[in-house]
Amino acid sequence: MQHASANSPAAVEHCPPDLHYLIEQQVWARVDADEGHATVGITALGIALAGDIYMCRPKRTGTVLAQGDAIAVVELAKSIVAVRSPVSGEVVQVNPLLEEQPERVHQQPYGEGWLVRMRLTDWDTDRGQLLHGDDVVPAMRHHAWLNRLES
């Protein structure tokens, strides 16, 4: 599977501006505060740093999580890694495509590769830990530099 490397401009520079990012965990949330919901996924940089994802198992519908709790488990070539939630809430939908097509996570990390949809329970507190807008790309560059992979 080909995807962006951790040092590639695509992994670092393409961060949709409408999302909120928990940089240290390399996850994002597309928040609809009016509706009280968020769609959650893994960043392109997070995927580039992790490598190929062979299996993705999000938490079940109805699971209640705090910001930073494990929202999914992904199986990589040589390890299994917990994916942390950028927001607190209850899982209300799991991406149905991921069961049969886990590659969607790295093919379209900000589109069809989303993990879960959540009903927000503490957005006012959670948002203080998330980056948004112009602060995101510099933080992604810094995270990529700190976690650069040896060729």
Where are the language model's segments positioned?
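Acidic, low-complexity mobile loops and tails
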Residues: 2-67, 112-122, 131-134, 141-151
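Short, conserved beta-turn/loop elements at beta-strand boundaries and strand-helix junctions
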Residues: 31-34, 94-100, 125
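Mid-chain, well-packed structural core segment of small domains
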Residues: 81-112
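Short, well-structured beta-strand-loop connectors
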Residues: 59-74, 90-92
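Short beta-strands and strand-coil junctions in structured, solvent-facing domains, enriched
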Residues: 80, 125-126
